[in-house]
Regions:
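Short, acidic/polar
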Residues: 2-11, 130-137
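Eukaryotic scaffold repeat domains enriched in small/polar residues
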Residues: 3, 59-60, 108-109, 255
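Cys-nucleophile CN-hydrolase/nitrilase-fold catalytic domain and related Cys-dependent amidase chemistry
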Residues: 4-87, 154-174, 178-179
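CN hydrolase (nitrilase-like) catalytic-core segments centered on the catalytic cysteine
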Residues: 47-64, 131-219
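Short beta-strand scaffold segments in enzyme catalytic cores
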Residues: 67-69, 80-84, 113, 201-203, ...
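Active-site catalytic loop in hydrolytic enzyme cores
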Residues: 73-151, 155-170, 227, 234-242
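A hydrophobic, small-residue-rich beta->alpha segment in the mid-to-C-terminal subdomain
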Residues: 213-231
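C-terminal/domain-edge helix-coil "capping" segments
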Residues: 236-256
Length: 256
């Protein structure tokens, strides 16, 4: 699998530069099932041990990888999933909560976990999930100081637009500032016979400062340090000091 070779190259670079976590794009293994002729052909059965076999070449003593793929469950359901691969084993999975704006072959995930590697506690929100404020806030409330955003904005040429990169960056800044967390987005970039992605990869710090931004339409490699200790108090989390605001917000959420 060519993607595994590419990821291995990036892991080797991470090892040489002292980088501890590598975030890969959404669906980097096999692409997105929504564009596959036979989605089951690119799906990986985690419970049968197939994922461990596929990821074995990525084993590293110092680098943890976040790898996107299509998961198939024993009952045949498909999930858009990211695996955390740490020291030769899968230590966690995140299933995309909002598979698509309109229609998708993927089932929605129903868990909002956080993960720990070394001193870093982090969450994962896949692509469209980042547009919703709730998953990020729930993860931050569980102690996450960073959010990784595997993304795949590869679209048919007539739909591809560089404006999508601007929208993604604005979303990253919003999630970072709202939750006082670092946001690390990893997108695909370039052209294939049928798809185009301008590439929205970037790193934003907890104050909303853009630390790194990828070149458009080309492969890139972004690096930044992230904070591992939650800032207290987190910005804007003390709305309860005004009971009227809290009551109105509770009513709004309840009525949605």
């Amino acid at each position: 699998m060519a993607a595994i070779d590419l990821i291995r190259e990036q892991i080797d670079r991470c090892e040489s530069e002292g980088i501890e976590i590598l975030c890969c794009p959404e669906g980097i293994l096999g692409g997105l099932a929504d564009y596959a002729i036979r989605p089951q052909d690119i799906a990986i059965d985690v419970e049968a041990g197939k994922l461990d076999e596929v990821l074995a070449p990525l084993a590293s003593d110092t680098v943890t990888s976040i790898v996107g793929f299509t998961e198939i469950t024993p009952n045949g359901r498909l999930h858009n999933t990211a695996a955390i691969y740490h020291r030769g084993g899968v230590i966690g999975l995140y299933r995309k909560l909002y598979p698509a704006i309109r229609k998708s072959v993927y089932e929605a995930g129903d868990e909002i976990p956080v993960f720990e590697v070394g001193a870093l506690k982090f969450g994962i929100v896949i692509c469209l999930d980042s547009n919703y404020l709730e998953p990020a806030r729930i993860m931050a409330a569980q102690g996450a100081t960073a959010l990784f955003v595997p993304t795949n904005n590869g679209l048919p040429a007539e739909k591809a637009d560089c404006a999508l990169c601007v929208q993604a960056r604005n979303v990253d800044i919003a999630r970072a500032v709202e939750n006082t967390v670092s946001v690390i987005r990893a997108d695909v970039a370039g052209r294939t016979e049928s798809l185009v992605s301008y590439g929205s990869s970037g790193i934003v710090d907890p104050d909303g400062m853009v630390l790194a931004s990828a070149r458009k339409l080309s492969e890139d490699f972004l690096v930044a340090d992230t904070e591992t200790t939650p800032r207290e108090p987190r910005r804007g989390w003390n709305a309860s000091t005004n009971s009227s605001v809290m009551k109105e917000y509770a009513r709004l959420v309840r009525d949605v």
